[in-house]
A protein has these predicted regions:
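Alpha-helical transmembrane segments of multi-pass membrane proteins
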Residues: 27, 66, 70, 74, ...
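Small-residue-rich helix-interface/hinge motifs
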Residues: 1-39, 244, 254-273
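Short helix-coil transition sites and intra-membrane helix breaks within transmembrane domains
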Residues: 211-216, 253-259
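Juxtamembrane boundary at the C-terminal end of a transmembrane helix
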Residues: 299-310
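Hydrophobic alpha-helical segments of integral membrane proteins
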Residues: 15-25, 29, 56, 60, ...
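PDZ peptide-recognition modules
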Residues: 6, 31-53, 58-61, 65-211, ...
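Membrane interface segments of multi-pass transport proteins and intramembrane proteases
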Residues: 3-6, 89-95, 268-284
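Membrane-interfacial loop-to-helix junctions in multi-pass transporters
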Residues: 231-240
Length: 310
């Protein structure tokens, strides 16, 4: 839409506002040696001519800032509105549902589901949504008296108007709210660890086929999610912002071409080899990675649009 430079001549950075407000980016001068052609800049101002440490710090800055932003948001969420229990302690098990009928009670702690270790509600939710060949789920539970018991639970299947089916277990977290400055600090870090752990499990499950790509949401799907979230209050919008910021950090840290993590991976190879990788080769690899990401994004967006018309 428009761009500008600061009046300070020592700062040649070009700032711009783009047509689609879907995120921010930094385009460093001379990211590749072939791009280092601007004669107005000194050689040491090109990124490709900076030391390995400097390039490494620049590349992890985005991920680091995403994490810091999420921690700040989660802290203020916990400080102002308080936080609920993050550990996988059963806080709600209504009668007439599979979990309570199996014998699991409020206060029990779910430690495993189908062999997956769970210690937070975020991870428990992910595990319950993974593909499972059998109808029965195995819950390993630590009872309030310290005993460890296993329960075989078959969830109810509820069919929505659009034909989609949802598995219902009848289990929930405690609604008790904890407040206070130090509790807010604890909540922000515990929640960060919980979301990161759940994100890694999600990515691993996508590669192994235990989670379908149809479970992912693209720009169109996120627009709908944000719209629905705004209807239920500011606290949920803030949490969603922190959640997305952490997700972006995790994805960007992956050692995949075109991601910052992929570029860091090439710096690590450079450290090991003692010399730079051919810039053309690295450029082609990042180009292929970017093309694959665009294909994935198109597929996910197509699925988002199909869901809108169901």
């Amino acid at each position: 839409i428009f761009s500008f430079k600061r009046k300070n001549k020592k700062d040649p950075t070009l700032y711009s506002v783009r047509l689609l407000p879907i995120g921010g980016f930094c385009a460093m001068a001379g990211e590749n040696e072939e791009d280092a052609t601007d004669l107005k800049l000194k050689k040491n101002q090109y990124m490709c001519n900076r030391s390995k440490w400097e390039r490494f710090l620049i590349l992890i800055a985005g991920v680091t800032n995403n994490i810091i932003l999420a921690l700040i948001i989660l802290f203020f969420q916990g400080l102002i509105w308080g936080s609920t229990e993050q550990k996988s302690i059963v806080g709600n098990a209504p009668e007439g549902y599979p979990v309570s009928e199996a014998g699991i009670e409020v206060g029990d702690v779910v430690t495993k589901v189908n062999g997956y270790k769970v210690n937070t509600w975020d991870k428990l939710t992910i595990v319950l949504n993974l593909k499972h060949k059998e109808d029965t789920y195995t819950f390993t539970v630590k009872k309030q008296n310290g005993d460890i018991k296993e329960y075989k639970i078959t969830p109810k299947t509820v069919k929505a108007e659009d034909g989609t089916e949802t598995k219902v277990f009848g289990i929930g977290a405690s609604s008790e709210v904890h407040k206070g400055f130090f509790n807010a600090i604890k909540y922000s870090f515990v929640k960060l660890g919980s979301i990161v752990s759940s994100m890694w499990l999600t990515l691993a499950s996508l590669f192994t086929g235990k989670l379908s790509l149809n479970n992912l949401a693209g720009p169109v799907g996120m627009y709908s999610i944000v719209g629905e979230t705004m209807k239920v209050g500011l606290v949920n919008v803030l949490y969603l912002t922190a959640y997305l910021s952490i997700n972006l950090a995790v994805i960007n840290a992956l050692p995949f071409p075109a991601f910052d993590g992929g570029r860091v991976f090439f710096i690590l190879i450079e450290w090991i080899r003692g010399k730079k990788i051919d810039q053309k080769v690295e450029g082609y690899i990042h180009m292929i990675g970017f093309a694959l990401l665009m294909l994935l994004m198109l597929y996910i967006t197509f699925q988002d649009i199909l869901r809108l018309f169901k």
